[in-house]
């Protein structure tokens, strides 16, 4: 088969390269900083994988398919890269997003529980539910060990024959012709291919500034880890699930591998440069600390034991970008993970590999034409 060049070895690019290689393509995977690096949107220790997406059924189905593929992959590599912690969706009495999530889970057939306030307090007494009146519990969902998972996918891709190149590439296709013939690395190497897939997250607007500079938005995000008291396992799995409180734009992950109790504000931060931005956390500390004291009283005075700065790479509304470059028929643009994309890597890799190999119609929500210049988030 004709050679394919994938630029970006994050979760999207790694799974695309892996799927293409397994279907017989000769694949070269290029990344400037390495799989799961700290500058990437796929870096960091952990990510939640949950099935609930409000009324957005396509993402529920993709997440469910991805969980199946992740688990099968980890059985061959490292089963500890997925932790079945369960995921708890906290809801106020009137909560349209969680109500529509419940309906979608029921329609698709995803295992779940609808829990009353009394059931919540009985099962998780270490949580002060405050205004939370009910919740959805997804018992089979959980946590992916993000950085290590990406490294594992790239490692398996190499075993399938993928050539990995650590390098930057030229910032845009040359302005002549309808086909891109090669990309040039920072060292001057020309990597030729028949198809080029740019799945490089927050670097997409830097590589294609005229096309994506005002359609993909990289934002600065903080993740904080607090240390539970010595010997207190109430905030570690299995006593504590991963959880989401969209009413206050917070989410968290139980203490896994002694890293601490992870909590973050799920609100788009200021613009951020993934190459040069300083990664010193602290801007969201006060808001997170106040929430921690309210919802998890035993952690009121817990010390901050670690912090990370990463970035989302957002589309205008949270839908992914999967489309051909409008000027180059053999160039694909894949990104817009928008803070929720990591979990979908396996299903997205299947989808893109099939489009590249077989053609077909791209779902309208993923098309470049739907990417506006103003952010108005609709996918959570």
Give the label of every model feature segment.
Residues 21-42:
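Glycine-rich FAD pyrophosphate-binding loop
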Residues 18-22, 78-84, 195-330:
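Active-site substrate-recognition segment that forms the wall
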Residues 137-195:
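Helical element adjacent to the flavin cofactor pocket in flavoenzyme catalytic cores
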Residues 46-123, 132, 249:
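Dinucleotide-binding Rossmann-like beta1-alpha1 core, especially the glycine-rich loop
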Residues 61, 89-97, 136-155, 277-286, ...:
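Short beta-strand to alpha-helix junction loop
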Residues 1-12, 28:
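Beta1/beta-strand and adjacent pyrophosphate-binding region of the FAD-binding site
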Residues 291-380:
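C-terminal catalytic lobe of FAD-dependent flavoproteins
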Residues 5-7, 190-203, 349:
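Short hydrophobic core segments
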């Amino acid at each position: 088969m004709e050679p394919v060049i994938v630029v970006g070895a994050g979760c999207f690019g790694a799974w695309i390269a892996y799927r293409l290689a397994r279907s017989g393509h000769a694949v070269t995977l290029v990344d400037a900083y390495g799989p799961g690096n700290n500058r990437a949107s796929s870096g960091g220790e952990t990510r939640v994988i949950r099935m609930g997406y409000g009324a957005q059924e396509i993402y529920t189905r993709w997440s469910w398919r991805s969980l199946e593929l992740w688990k099968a992959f980890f059985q061959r590599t490292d089963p500890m890269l997925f932790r079945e912690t369960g995921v708890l969706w906290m809801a106020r009495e009137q909560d349209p997003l969680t109500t529509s999530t419940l309906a979608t889970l029921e329609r698709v057939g995803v295992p779940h529980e609808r829990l009353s306030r009394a059931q919540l307090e009985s099962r998780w007494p270490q949580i002060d539910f405050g205004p939370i009146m009910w919740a959805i519990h997804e018992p089979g969902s959980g946590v992916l060990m993000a950085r290590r998972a990406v490294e594992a996918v790239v490692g398996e891709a190499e075993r399938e024959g993928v050539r990995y190149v650590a390098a930057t590439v030229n910032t845009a296709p040359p302005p002549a012709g309808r086909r891109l013939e090669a990309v040039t690395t920072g060292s001057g190497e020309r990597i030729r291919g028949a198809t080029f897939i740019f799945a490089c997250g927050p670097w997409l607007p830097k590589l294609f500034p005229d096309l994506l500079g005002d359609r993909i938005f990289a934002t600065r995000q903080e993740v904080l880890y607090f240390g539970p008291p010595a010997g207190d396992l109430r905030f570690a799995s299995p006593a504590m699930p991963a959880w989401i409180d969209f009413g206050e734009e917070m989410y968290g992950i139980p203490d896994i591998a002694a890293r601490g109790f992870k909590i973050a504000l799920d609100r788009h931060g200021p613009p951020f440069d993934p190459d040069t931005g300083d990664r010193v956390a602290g801007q969201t500390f006060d808001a997170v600390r106040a929430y921690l004291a309210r919802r998890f009283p035993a952690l009121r005075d817990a010390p901050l034991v670690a912090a990370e700065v990463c970035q989302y790479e957002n589309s205008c509304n949270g839908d992914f970008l999967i489309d051909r470059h409008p000027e180059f028929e053999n160039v694909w643009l894949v990104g817009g993970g928008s803070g929720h994309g990591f979990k979908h890597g396996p299903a997205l890799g299947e989808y893109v590999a099939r489009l590249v190999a077989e053609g077909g119609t791209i779902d309208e929500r993923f098309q470049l034409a739907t990417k506006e210049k103003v952010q108005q988030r609709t996918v959570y």
